[in-house]
Structure formats: structure tokens, C-alpha cells
């Protein structure tokens, strides 16, 4: 998506995905578009995500992401990693 890939960025993405899995989102993908972090989860889990939105946003900002978004299309395994 035009975002330069670095080991530091990959480590932050991995940390965010692992943390979300620990919070009860077993199917999750984080995608980075510049300053935007796009979170993909199963659509069935959207209400759980919204209930935890403040906690999730705080954690993702702690990891260094600026703008945190939930992808309205849900998890899609066929798109690019970053």
C-alpha cells in the first residue's frame, strides 16, 4: 500500500496482532497505510471491538500508530499484509 516496510514496523504490527488475539480476537490482521492502521477482524466480532474501542485505540497508539480504524469489510485473507 505504499508504506515502506521495516523490521521495526513489522515488529509493531506483530505486537498489535498478538495483543488483539490475547484480547479475544483470534482472527485479526493489521494493515498499515502511512499514519493509518487498519484493523481487520471477523464481522461477527465488530460489537466486541466497539465495546473495547478505547482500550484498543490506546494500545495501538502505545505501539506508535497514529490513526486507528476498523475495516468495515472485515477480515480478508487475500489482501496484502502491509
Predicted regions and their residues:
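ATP/NTP-dependent adenylation/nucleotidyl-transfer catalytic domains that generate, transfer
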Residues: 1-82
Amino acid at each position: 500500500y505504499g508504506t515502506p516496510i521495516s523490521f521495526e514496523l513489522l515488529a509493531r504490527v506483530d505486537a498489535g496482532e498478538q495483543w488483539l488475539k490475547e484480547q479475544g480476537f483470534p482472527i485479526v490482521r493489521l494493515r498499515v497505510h502511512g499514519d493509518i492502521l487498519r484493523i481487520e477482524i471477523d464481522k461477527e466480532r465488530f460489537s466486541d471491538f466497539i465495546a473495547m474501542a478505547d482500550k484498543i485505540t490506546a494500545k495501538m497508539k502505545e505501539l506508535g500508530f497514529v490513526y486507528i480504524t476498523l475495516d468495515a469489510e472485515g477480515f480478508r485473507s487475500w489482501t496484502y499484509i502491509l
